[in-house]
Amino acid sequence: MKNELMQRLRLKYPPPDGYCRWGRIQDVSATLLNAWLPGVFMGELCCIKPGEELAEVVGINGSKALLSPFTSTIGLHCGQQVMALRRRHQVPVGEALLGRVIDGFGRPLDGRELPDVCWKDYDAMPPPAMVRQPITQPLMTGIRAIDSVATCGEGQRVGIFSAPGVGKSTLLAMLCNAPDADSNVLVLIGERGREVREFIDFTLSEETRKRCVIVVATSDRPALERVRALFVATTIAEFFRDNGKRVVLLADSLTRYARAAREIALAAGETAVSGEYPPGVFSALPRLLERTGMGEKGSITAFYTVLVEGDDMNEPLADEVRSLLDGHIVLSRRLAERGHYPAIDVLATLSRVFPVVTSHEHRQLAAILRRCLALYQEVELLIRIGEYQRGVDTDTDKAIDTYPDICTFLRQSKDEVCGPELLIEKLHQILTE
C-alpha cells in the first residue's frame, strides 16, 4: 500500500538530478517533527525511513526543518533518517474523478484504483484580475430563499454562516443539485466519519454523485490533511474551469480548515494574534479564495460554510471571510427551532452581484419581499402580546397579511427544485395580488 502511495504521488527515487539530501529526526511532537535537514525549501516533500512515510516542510530555521507528516506521528522516533525529495505535493485532476471519493491528499477512499489522470501542484496562483471574465450570468440554485432575494452569479464566492445544527448540511446537499452546474466538487473537512458516509449515501442523489468529486478529511485525520483537502478540491475545480465548465465548489467548512491551519502554525511557533488565530491563517485565506471565481473560459462558483460560535457573526474569522467573499447566506437558529427550513435569514443574507444578474422586475419584487419581512419583524412582539392596532399603517398591515404566504414560499423540502420562471410567478402572486 505504501509503494502504491508513492507511485500515486509520482515520487520516484532518486530525485531527478541523482542527488539525495539526507537528514535525521531530532524531535517528535504530536503534530510536527523537528529534523536536521539542510537545504530544503518550504513545501518540499520528504520521506521518512526506513518506511515510506511522507511529510512536508512547513518551517525552516537554518539547517533545521519543521515537518508536518501525512500520517500520525505515533511510532516515529528521534534518529530516523529523512530524505528530501526536491518536489512538492501534486494532486490528481481529470474527468475520471467524477463520481469518486478521495482523501485530503488525493488518494482514493472508495476502494477503487486511481484512474489515469493528470497531475497538478496543489497551490496554484489565482488568475490575474484582468484575465477573469466579469460575472454577468445568474447561477440558479433552485432554492427559493436564495434565488429570490440573493441570486448568485456564475463565478461568485459565497459564505454560508451558520451555528451547528441548523441545517447546514442539508442546504449543501440542495446546492449540489444546482441545475445550472456542469460538475460539482464537494470537500468535507473535519466532519465525523459517520456523518460523511450518511451524507454521501443518503443525502446526495445518485445523479448528483455521478457529476461530483468528493474530497474527505475527517476530524481524526492529521492537521496537514485537513488543511490540504481544501487545496486539493480547489485544484480539481480549477481543472474543470480551465476546460470551460461551470463548476460549483462546496466546502464544509472553512472554519475547520482554519482550525487545522492554526494547529500547525501554533506548533511551528507562530503567535496567535486575532481570535486565537496566528497571522499566517489570515494571510493564506485571500490567496486560497481568489483561486475560485471566473476564469478565461469557465467559472467556479464557490460556497464556503463558516461555523460561528454562539451565533456571533462578528468573530474575527467570520468577519475576515465575509470581507473577502462576494456575498453571504446566514442561517438562523430561531428559524430552525420553528421548523422553518432552509433556515435562511433573508434580511441578513446578501449577494453583491444580485443587481448585475437579475432583471429590474426581479429586483423590485425582492425589495418588496425584504420590506414586508422587515416591517413584520418590527411589530412581531406587539402582535404576539395582542397590542398591535390595524389601520395605523397600511404598509405594515399588508406585511402582516402577506407574512404567512412569504413563509410558505421561503420553506422548501430538500428534494424540491424551483425554476426561475416559477419563482417570479410565485413572487407576483404573493406580493402584487
From Swiss-Prot:
Disruption phenotype: Deletion mutant cannot secrete the effector proteins SseB, SseC, SseD, SseF, SseG and SseJ. Mutant is also defective for the secretion of the translocon proteins SseC/SctE and SseD/SctB. Mutant shows decreased virulence in the mouse model of systemic infection. One of its GO terms (molecular function) is protein-exporting ATPase activity. Keywords: ATP-binding, Cytoplasm, Nucleotide-binding, Protein transport, Translocase, Transport, Virulence. Gene3D superfamilies: 1.20.1270.330, P-loop containing nucleotide triphosphate hydrolases. It is found in: Cytoplasm. CDD domains: ATP-synt_flagellum-secretory_path_III_N, ATPase_flagellum-secretory_path_III. It comes from the Bacteria. Coiled coil: none annotated. ATPase component of the type III secretion system (T3SS), also called injectisome, which is used to inject bacterial effector proteins into eukaryotic host cells. Acts as a molecular motor to provide the energy that is required for the export of proteins. Required for type III secretion apparatus (T3SA) formation, secretion of a subset of SPI-2 effectors and virulence. May play a critical role in T3SS substrate recognition, disassembly of the effector/chaperone complex and unfolding of the effector in an ATP-dependent manner prior to secretion. The core secretion machinery of the T3SS is composed of approximately 20 different proteins, including cytoplasmic components, a base, an export apparatus and a needle. This subunit is part of the cytosolic complex. Forms homohexamers. Forms a complex with SsaK/SctL (stator protein) and SsaQ/SctQ (the major sorting platform component). Interacts with the T3SS-2 specific chaperones SsaE, SseA, SscA, SscB, and SrcA. This is SPI-2 type 3 secretion system ATPase. It comes from Salmonella typhimurium (strain LT2 / SGSC1412 / ATCC 700720).
